Amino acid sequence: MNLIIDIGNTVAKVALFDRTSMVEVVYDSNQSLDSLEAVCNKYDVRKAIVATVIDLNECVLAQLNKLPVPVLWLDSHTSLPVINLYETPETLGYDRMAAVVAAHDQFPGKDILVIDAGTCITYEFVDSLGQYHGGNISPGLWMRLKALHQFTGRLPLVHAEGRMPDMGKDTETAIRAGVKKGIEYEITGYITAMKHKYPELLVFLTGGDDFSFDTKLKSVIFADRFLVLKGLNRILNYNNGRI
């Protein structure tokens, strides 16, 4: 079994893969990894990969360093099954690259736009030759809602869930509709522009936030909430024998 440890800005995910098939995923605190020991005792883990976008505290580091299997710590020097053309690979978030790797692994030989709607919304492009050209970073749903509250004097902090008319009927619905529809239009705009350049473009959407798209747009999107975990597993398998 492969142990995949994905430590994000808000939560950690601990997943188990049997070769290329995901067996289980556990959501955990990124400050403690309480589930790690139980997961390791439950399965016959042979190797692991650790990927983090935050600085790990001593408790988490101690747990990871006690893992009784070879561990691949994902960084800018890790060998990848795609060609990385990013000019500053040391600043590239592991989650961005892992999502690209997973999408390319599923559809090699295709031009692919990968959209990850999480804390931030990222847009990544990998071409049919497996060359990762880079991507863009935009504020995510919660970040936009929070910014409207923090950087103004009177706008309230609005929850993402709730009534959302086409045009807001009060301040709460105006903020919710403005932010969520703004994100939907942004994503639609990226897809439209990229498909103009690459008519056979495939689109992957992952991340924790769900958005509504019209029927025509839905037909070109592959939604996969576990794309990053699958990419990390692919990277671990690709580096088999190097750890």
From Swiss-Prot:
Alphabetized InterPro entries for the sequence: ATPase_NBD, Type_III_PanK
The organism of origin for this protein: Bacteroides fragilis (strain YCH46)
Active site, UniProt feature: D95
PANTHER family found in the cross-reference section: TYPE III PANTOTHENATE KINASE
Keyword Metal-binding tagged: yes
Reaction(s) the record says it catalyses: (R)-pantothenate + ATP = (R)-4'-phosphopantothenate + ADP + H(+)
This protein's name: Type III pantothenate kinase
Alphabetized SUPFAM superfamilies for the sequence: Actin-like ATPase domain
Classification via HAMAP family: Pantothen_kinase_3 (MF_01274)
Cystine crosslinks: none
Chain residues that bind substrate: Y86, G93, Y94, D95, R96, T171
Keywords: ATP-binding, Coenzyme A biosynthesis, Cytoplasm, Kinase, Metal-binding, Nucleotide-binding, Potassium, Transferase
Pathway: Cofactor biosynthesis; coenzyme A biosynthesis; CoA from (R)-pantothenate: step 1/5
SUBUNIT field: Homodimer.
